[in-house]
């Protein structure tokens, strides 16, 4: 079911792109005068408040867009970007002492309002990237005991995505040792900016992390000890939430991105991604990767055509 949303854009925000999500317009009073400029966008569901409409009509610092969208992050992000003709958004934030409780926030990485000025600056050569998250087993590599690459074309195609400025993340539900061994066997480690393993089921407590002596892996490997904002019973299967990926990118100083894509053989792992590319399982090597690369590239081209070509300068 679609909801009616209001999104305000601060014309002279100090920190561009970040979105503050409120439960109601009156909650702006909790922000504090100095923090107004932390957020270019303020988003909330509309309840027909005359106070809200009247206040915005007389406030020259903000421009207002109203739209109808489902209460999910893909739809909300799409409508905000379309309404304000922007291809890039920053972090989604909530008030620490009165956080909004919309469904779209359930599995999206959110910051509290006071954390925005504490964010690390971008330290790598990524300028508003597309993010592509890859599964490992039966997606990039075979299911054989002695693993092989699915298709030698993968090496050139991952390089192509990197050359286009994409951030590449590997997320496998295999053990850390399995992931490290498999990546070494097929020489894929250098292609990824971050590597995540384990975390396929809900646990009552985080699993112990195993250290690795592989220095190349250490520079990219990220612990999977994340908490999920979902009511999953212990042992329940979990999707590959963008929340984890966005947190990792923030830790690396990447606070803005265009789209986020999941490439995986299991549709159940898809949760709130902008794009999902479903690949056929590969128990043994196949020479079929180019079709998936073309789908990834077509999605990115579609995105840039939809948002970037219409962006507000």
From Swiss-Prot:
- State one Pfam family annotation: DUF705
Q: Which residues form the signal peptide?
A: none
Q: Record's Gene3D superfamilies?
A: HAD superfamily/HAD-like (3.40.50.1000)
CDD domains recorded: HAD_like
Checking InterPro entries in the record gives: DUF705, HAD-like_sf, HAD_sf, HAD_SF_ppase_IIIC
Highest taxon above the source species: Viruses
The protein's name is Uncharacterized 36.0 kDa protein
């Amino acid at each position: 079911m679609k909801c009616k949303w209001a999104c305000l854009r601060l014309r002279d925000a100090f920190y561009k792109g970040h979105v503050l999500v409120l439960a109601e317009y009156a909650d702006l009073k909790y922000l504090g005068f100095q923090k107004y400029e932390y957020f270019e966008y303020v988003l909330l569901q509309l309840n027909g408040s005359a106070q809200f409409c009247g206040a915005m009509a007389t406030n020259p610092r903000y421009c207002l867009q109203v739209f109808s969208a489902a209460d999910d992050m893909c739809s909300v992000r799409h409508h905000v970007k379309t309404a304000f003709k922007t291809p890039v958004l920053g972090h989604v934030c909530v008030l620490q002492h009165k956080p909004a409780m919309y469904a779209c926030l359930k599995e999206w990485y959110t910051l509290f309002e006071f954390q925005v000025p504490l964010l690390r600056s971008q330290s790598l050569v990524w300028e508003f990237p597309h993010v592509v998250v890859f599964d490992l087993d039966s997606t990039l590599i075979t299911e054989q005991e002695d693993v092989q690459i699915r298709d030698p074309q993968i090496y050139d195609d991952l390089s192509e995505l990197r050359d286009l400025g994409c951030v590449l993340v590997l997320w496998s539900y295999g053990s850390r040792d399995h992931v490290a061994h498999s990546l070494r066997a097929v020489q894929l480690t250098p292609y990824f900016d971050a590597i995540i393993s384990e975390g396929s089921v809900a646990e009552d407590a985080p699993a112990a992390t195993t250290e690795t002596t592989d220095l190349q892996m250490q520079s990219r490997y990220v612990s999977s000890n994340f908490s999920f904002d979902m009511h999953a019973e212990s042992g329940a299967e979990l999707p590959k939430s963008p929340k984890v990926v966005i947190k990792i990118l923030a830790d690396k100083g990447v606070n803005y991105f265009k789209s986020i894509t999941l490439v995986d053989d299991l549709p159940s792992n898809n949760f709130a991604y902008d794009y999902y590319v479903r690949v056929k399982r590969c128990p043994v090597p196949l020479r079929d990767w180019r079709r998936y690369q073309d789908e990834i590239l077509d999605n990115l081209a579609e995105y840039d055509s939809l948002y970037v070509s219409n962006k507000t300068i």
